[in-house]
Swiss-Prot record:
UniProt protein name: NADH-ubiquinone oxidoreductase chain 4L
UniProt similarity note: Belongs to the complex I subunit 4L family.
GO BP of this protein: ATP synthesis coupled electron transport
Species classification: Eukaryota, Metazoa, Chordata, Craniata, Vertebrata
Transmembrane segments: 1-21, 29-49, 61-81
Membrane topology, record value: Multi-pass membrane protein
GO molecular function: NADH dehydrogenase (ubiquinone) activity
Function as written in the Swiss-Prot or TrEMBL entry: Core subunit of the mitochondrial membrane respiratory chain NADH dehydrogenase (Complex I) which catalyzes electron transfer from NADH through the respiratory chain, using ubiquinone as an electron acceptor. Part of the enzyme membrane arm which is embedded in the lipid bilayer and involved in proton translocation.
Catalysis performed (reactions): a ubiquinone + NADH + 5 H(+)(in) = a ubiquinol + NAD(+) + 4 H(+)(out)
Annotated localization: Mitochondrion inner membrane
Length: 98
């Protein structure tokens, strides 16, 4: 395995471990999720360039669109929780149910 793929995979694993360790705060979880999406985007972009398959070049762009949507929804939840309760704990998400 080339070193660049190993580094990107290591970045994904470190972000996953960060998500598991800091799951009580929403902001930390969102940052770790963004790190995971960035490493997946980089890995998909490198793989699509190396495969020389023209249809696979749209996959990283679709992943980037989903990452932007995930960030927007996450930040909206973070703002709503922090305005309502003043904290960014994930435990407060259960209180937002109707």
């Amino acid at each position: 395995m080339p070193y660049i793929y190993m580094n990107i995979t290591l970045a994904f694993v470190i972000s996953l471990i960060g998500t598991l360790m800091y799951r009580s705060h929403l902001m930390s979880s969102l940052l770790c999720l963004e790190g995971m999406m960035l490493s997946l985007f980089t890995l998909n972009a490198l793989l699509s360039l190396n495969m020389n398959f023209t249809l696979s070049t749209t996959v990283p762009l679709i992943l980037l669109v989903f990452a932007a949507c995930e960030a927007a929804v996450g930040l909206a939840l973070l703002i709503m929780i922090s305005n309502t309760y003043g904290l960014d704990y994930v435990q407060n998400l259960n209180l937002l149910q109707c």
